[in-house]
Amino acid sequence: MLAFMASDSEEEVCDERTSLMSAESPTSRSCQEGRPGPEDGESTAQWRTQESEEDCEEDPDRYACSGAPGRPSGLEEELTLKYGAKRVIMLFVPVTLCMIVVVATIKSVRFYTEKNGQLIYTPFTEDTPSVGQRLLNSVLNTLIMISVIVVMTIFLVVLYKYRCYKFIHGWLIMSSLMLLFLFTYIYLGEVLKTYNVAMDYPTLFLAVWNFGAVGMVCIHWKGPLVLQQAYLIVISALMALVFIKYLPEWSAWVILGAISVYDLVAVLCPKGPLRMLVETAQERNEPIFPALIYSSAMVWTVGMAKLDPSSQGALQLPYDPEMEEDSYDSFGEPSYPEAFEAPLPGYPGEELEEEEERGVKLGLGDFIFYSVLVGKAAATGNGDWNTTLACFIAILIGLCLTLLLLAVFKKALPALPISITFGLIFYFSTDNLVRPFMDTLASHQLYI
């Protein structure tokens, strides 16, 4: 439930596109070429006057480092707009897809709108005519739900603090197995019933097995980045549908407000569990759990991208089983073989390390609660489309503001408070003000 940039340190040597590179990262070749040496000042000045504009158009990255000579005026603002907007879009697309899947399911499959049970974390029912009793039950359900989330988060942080990577990895694998197999089987069965599509059980089991097996490989081992992102979106949508179905209506709204406050405290407080988790991962130079984080970054590891040794000059090392026990990569997962690039011409003996991941990372909890808010807006009451679209736009506006603050402060920030606050305000204002106004206009056949 946090958003953060993939950076190991708050002290950067570069800005704009490479602002996420830490001070310990090796300087790229383009940056080194742009810095004049003491012995070639005249040649640098000549190169600056003759080729600055041409090289800027062909390769803007060579001016990405601060202090590079010959940077044209306005290039910094152009790169900020280009790559800042790119990061926003790279998060808008998955969040939008997740919410679209949830809303489409709510509008078409009646199973997820039928109230025939509750979660064990919300034992108090709201089937009472008394408004006060219903409000009290929703508050009690919220306290129990938030307490469970706090305890499990602290438990996860303690396990990670003491390097219990295998236990955490097994925990995440069991959760992924349940989501990718059991919940997918239930979802697919209800969709087939809704659209009256006949399918025999062997074919259904085979489809679920193939879907789940590929998802487990992509999430917990290796696979294309796009496929991994797609499975994380599907997992978030399935979990959101479960919350929408089994959370009581009033309890769901109170839980959304409380979880945004908890997210604010857990990320920004010095001893907050999520902040301690991120800081510990940065100190150890390790990635956050791959099954809990959606990454919008371009990934250069062999596990997520295909490298052609003939064209890239890279050597892919074979997998060594002994590395599984010694490496802490991916929190106890088998290490991904790394690719080492050959020294570039003109730089003999210089060995470039693997380029650092850049981009914005968003927790899957944010996807889930964004979708819960929009799904509840689509499922409760009259299911008015104006209310649903208002919540959808509010979440995207809040996410955009969160990313703006992330670019300003350059540290892990909670992604729920702004979006959830806007979503709740837009929901209740649209449902109680805009919808009655539109209904009145329609009943009197007035058009604006």
Curated annotation (Swiss-Prot):
Q: Which PANTHER family match?
A: PRESENILIN (PTHR10202), PRESENILIN-2 (PTHR10202:SF24)
GO molecular function list? aspartic endopeptidase activity, intramembrane cleaving; endopeptidase activity
Q: Which SMART domains match?
A: PSN (SM00730)
Tissue specificity, please? Ubiquitously expressed. Highly expressed in the liver.
What Gene Ontology terms describe where this protein resides (cellular component)?
ciliary basal body; cytosol; endoplasmic reticulum; endoplasmic reticulum membrane; gamma-secretase complex; glutamatergic synapse; Golgi apparatus; Golgi membrane
One Pfam family, please name it.
Presenilin
Q: How does it assemble?
A: Homodimer. Component of the gamma-secretase complex, a complex composed of a presenilin homodimer (PSEN1 or PSEN2), nicastrin (NCSTN), APH1 (APH1A or APH1B) and PEN2. Such minimal complex is sufficient for secretase activity, although other components may exist. Interacts with DOCK3. Interacts with HERPUD1, FLNA, FLNB and PARL.
Q: What positions are modified (Phosphoserine)?
A: 22, 25, 30, 52
Enumerate the Cytoplasmic topological stretches: 1-87, 160-166, 222-223, 271-358, 410-413, 435-448
Which residue intervals are annotated as intramembrane in the UniProt record?
A: 414-434
**Family per record:** Belongs to the peptidase A22A family.
Task: Supply the alphabetized keyword list.
Answer: Endoplasmic reticulum, Golgi apparatus, Hydrolase, Membrane, Notch signaling pathway, Phosphoprotein, Protease, Transmembrane, Transmembrane helix
Domain comment? The PAL motif is required for normal active site conformation.
The UniProt record lists the EC number as: 3.4.23.-
Q: What is this protein called?
A: Presenilin-2
Bias (Polar residues) ranges: 19-31
The residues annotated as the active site are 263, 366
Annotated stretches, region: Disordered: 1-74
Task: List the Lumenal topological domains.
Answer: 109-138, 188-200, 245-249, 380-388
Q: Does the keyword tRNA processing apply?
A: no
Q: Which residues form a coiled coil?
A: none
Q: InterPro entries of this UniProt entry?
A: Pept_A22A_PS2, Peptidase_A22A, Preselin/SPP, Presenilin_C
The residue numbers the entry assigns to motif PAL are 414-416
Q: Which residues cross the membrane?
A: 88-108, 139-159, 167-187, 201-221, 224-244, 250-270, 359-379, 389-409
User: Membrane topology per the record?
Assistant: Multi-pass membrane protein
